[in-house]
Amino acid sequence: SGLLSLIKQGVTVAEIRRPAEPNAFFLDSPVQEQYEWAEDLLNRTHFNDTGVTVCILDTGVNSDHKLISPYMPTSCATVNSSWGTRDKYGHGTNMAGVVLYNDLKRHLITDVPFELNHTVESVKILEPNSPTEATLYGAVTQQAISLSEIYNPTAKHIYCMAITDPTSGLNNGQPSSWSAAIDQISSEGQKKLFIVSAGNVEEDELTMDGYPDACLNKSIEDPAQAWNALTVGAYSLDTDIQPCRETAGYSPLAQSGELSPYSSTSNGWKSQWPIKPEVVCDGGNVASDGKNLISGMDELSKLTLSKDINRRLFDTIWATSAATAQCSYLSAELMAVYPSMKPETVRALIVHSARWTTQMINQFGFPDTKNIGRKNLLRTCGYGVPNLEIAKDTLNNRVNMIIEGELQPYEKKGSSTKMKEMHIHTLPWPESVLQTLENTMVKVRVTLSYFIEPGPGQKGWKNKYRYPSSGLRFDIKRPNETIEQFQQRINKLMRDDNYQRGSSINNNWYLGSKNRDVGSIHSDVWEDTAINLAQSGVLAVYPVVGWWRERTTLKKYNSKLPYSLVVTIETPDENVDLYTPIMTKIASKVTVPIITSDDT
C-alpha cells in the first residue's frame, strides 16, 4: 500500500524488487510445502546433458532427494564397502545442493526457468564414526578418483572436496603426502581439476584472537596447500539477522563483502609457497553479541538441500564448504560452455575472472604497495571473487584471448641437463586502436596455469624448486624493446636461476613477480598508456628450474609440460571496439616456439 501511494503521488520508482525471503521461511515450512517448492523448481529446470559432472568426495549424497535424483545418473560409490553409501552425516548432500543450484533460494522464490548444464556424482571418503588413518588420506583420495572413472568413464570430471585435516600439524605451506597425492592425481594421464576447501576458523579461535586476526593466524589446512588444486576460501555476503529472542543483541562479525570469519589463509606462510586460497566464494558469516558467538546461524548461511528428506528437504551450509561447492558450480558451468577446454584452462579462467571487493581492499589492501597491502590481499583473499560472466564472455572493450600450449622445459646435452624451450606469443593485438587512444590507461591481465608433477619420495619437498617437476613464468615485451632484445632478456631469465629482474621491469605489474611467481598458477595486471601497450602485444612463457632437470637419474628431462595462458585487454570506455580488430587478426599464427641456443 505504501508503494502504491508513492506511485499515485507521481514519485518515480526505478525498480520494484521482491524482498529477500529469510532462510527460515523455507526451513520452517511444513514438509508438504517444501515438496511443492521443490516440484515447482523441478518443473522450471531445463537440463542440458553436456557430459560435465562434479564428483563430490565427502560423506556420501542422498541420491533419493527430489532435487538431486534427476541429475545424479550414476550410483553412489564408497571407498569402504562396510560404510555403505548413505549420507548419515548430511554434509555431502548439503554440498550437492550448492553444486547443482548454486543460489538455491533465488531459484525457489522466482518463476524464471533454470538452466542446469552438469550433473553430480558421489564417492564417500569419510565416515565420522569410522575415521581413516591420516597416513592413508592420499591413498583413499586416489582410490575415490579411480572409482569415479570406473563408474562414469566418459564424463568430464571436476572433483570437489571440502574435507581437510585440522590436526595435521602442517601450517607452513609445505607439501604433505595428501596434498602431493592431489598434485599427482591432477597431473597424471588425463589431467583433472581438483577444487578443495581452504579449511575453517573455529569458534574458539575466533573467541581467542578476534576477527579478522583469527583468520590471519589460522593456516590453510592440509591438503589445501596442493599446488595444482584450486583452493577456495570464503567471504561474507549476508548480514541480516532476523530479530528473535535467541538472536537479540547479536550482529554479524564481518561486513558484507569482507573476508568471512570462517576463512583460513596463507598469511603466515613463507613467500616461497603457493598463494592460497586462489579465490573466495560466499561462505556466510558469524554472529556475535560481544561475548558469545553463533556459527552456522541459518540467516547467515546458504540455503541448500537436506539428507533427511522425510522430515525436510532444505538445510543450510556455511564456511569454506559452501564456498567450495559454489566454485565447483562455476567451474562446471564454464566447462559446459567450453567442453573441449583443458582443466588447466578452467582453473585459469576462474582465477582470471576473480576480483577483490572494495571491502576486502579496505580490510587488507593498505598501504597499497606490492610488499604489504597487495601481498596481504593475496594471502588472505586470493585473487578475489570469481565472476562467471567475466570468465566466459568477451565484450567489445574487454577481450579474452586463450592459448593452450605445451613446451619441453629441459633437454640433456652431454652430461648436463639444460633449458630447452620458451614460447613467444605474438598476440592478435589491436595496435591501431590503441594508438588512437594515446594516453588512455589500458589494462592487460595475464594468467598462466599448468599442473606440476610432485617430486617422488618426498625428497627436497621443503624446497620450492625441488618439489615441482618444472615451473613456468610469463613476461611481456616492454615498449620500445625489439623482439630480439625481448628474447635475449628471457633467455637470461631462463639461464640463471639466481637472476634478479631490475626493479624498473616490475613497475607496471600490479602484483609483481615476487608475489605472483609461486605455485603453479600466476596472474597479474599490467596497466599502461594505450600508446605504450600498442607496442607490447608479445608475451613469453618460459621455464624455470624443477626436479625434471635436477634429478637426472629419473630421466624425466625430455618430458613436456602443457600450459594454459589467458590474456585480457580492457579499456575503461565501453564504446571502444577492441574485439573487431582482434578477430580480424585471429587467423594469424599466434605461437612461435623458440629453441634456446647451446650455451643456455
PLM region spans:
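Autoinhibitory propeptides
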Residues: 1-43
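Subtilisin-like serine protease catalytic core
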Residues: 42-75, 82-136, 189-191, 225-229, ...
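Catalytic-core environment of secreted peptidases
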Residues: 59-80, 235-252, 259-324
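Substrate-binding/access-modulating region of protease and related hydrolase catalytic domains
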Residues: 126-228, 236-239, 311-318, 322-324
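Short, small-residue alpha-helix embedded
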Residues: 323-337
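Hard-cation-handling environments
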Residues: 343-344, 352, 356, 381, ...
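Secreted peptidase-domain scaffold signal
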Residues: 371-468, 472
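Long mid-to-C-terminal assembly/interaction modules of large eukaryotic proteins
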Residues: 441-600
